[in-house]
A protein has these predicted regions:
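Membrane-interface helix-capping segments at transmembrane helix termini in multi-pass transporters
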Residues: 16-26, 37-73, 119-128, 153-155
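Residue-level signature of transmembrane alpha-helical cores of multipass secondary-active transporters
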Residues: 32, 68-72, 76, 98, ...
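Membrane-interface junctions at transmembrane-helix termini in multi-pass inner-membrane proteins
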Residues: 77-104, 121-124
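Helix-loop junctions and terminal segments of transmembrane helices
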Residues: 1-15, 90-91, 149-150
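Alpha-helical transmembrane segments of multi-pass membrane proteins
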Residues: 45-46, 57-82, 99, 103, ...
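Interhelical loop/hinge segments that connect adjacent transmembrane helices in multipass membrane
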Residues: 124, 141-189, 193
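Membrane-interface helix-loop junctions in multi-pass transport and translocation proteins
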Residues: 96, 107-139, 147
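Membrane-embedded alpha-helical segments of multi-pass transporters/permeases
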Residues: 40-48, 71, 110-118, 138-146, ...
Length: 195
């Protein structure tokens, strides 16, 4: 989805259309908020369906799986609107900032997770820490985009024609990602089928 934002934003920026850039930012943010809300609704809905977890789990394991699914759903839902700001950092070529945020997450993650594991905390705590990292990196990106990059937003006149065009572009990108993932994981899939 980030590649669609980069493509259309760079096209508008090259044309010098600042108002178009602001409308595009608003449109992407609204679209990604809607997608995030859909992920939230689907994830929470699935967390209440015992069929999803199968029949081999105990009641305690199902309860744990439900909590984990809810936390991971919130994490996934937040990544959609946050990706608008991360893509804006990319389009403005602030790679050093991106690398510092990514390295901060990579360094802090084991520094926090390993002591928590050694203290006896389990998967729910680790998943919550992962959610906290997502929120913190998102807040940092949002703050950077709004203060340093002066990211403009306009939320009037939603451009449905552009949304259709963008959807067509995104479908091809999505198919490419799925094919790439299938190619990279076919060996594991075959092993699980035949094992």
């Amino acid at each position: 989805l980030g590649s669609a934002y980069v493509r259309y934003y760079s096209r508008l920026r090259a044309a010098g259309d600042r108002e178009g850039c602001a409308k595009l930012n608003g449109m992407f943010l609204i679209t990604y908020l809607i997608l995030g809300a859909a992920v939230l609704a689907i994830g929470f809905g699935l967390s209440y369906c015992d069929v999803v977890f199968g029949k081999k789990l105990t009641a305690e394991e199902i309860s744990l799986a439900q909590r984990l699914l809810r936390i991971l759903t919130v994490n996934a839902a937040l990544t959609f609107p946050i990706s608008v700001f991360e893509s804006h950092v990319t389009i403005n070529e602030r790679y050093l900032f991106q690398k510092i945020v990514a390295m901060g997450k990579q360094v802090l993650n084991p520094l926090i997770m390993i002591p928590l594991l050694l203290m006896g905390y389990r998967s729910v705590t680790l998943t919550i820490v992962s959610l906290i990292f997502t929120v913190l990196s998102g807040v940092i990106n949002i703050f950077y985009c709004l203060t340093r990059l002066k990211m403009p937003f306009a939320f009037h006149r939603y451009d449905f024609a552009l949304l259709r065009e963008m959807f067509g572009f995104t479908v091809y990108v999505f198919i490419g990602i799925v094919v790439d993932n299938v190619n990279w994981s076919i060996d594991r899939t075959l092993l699980t089928w035949f094992h």
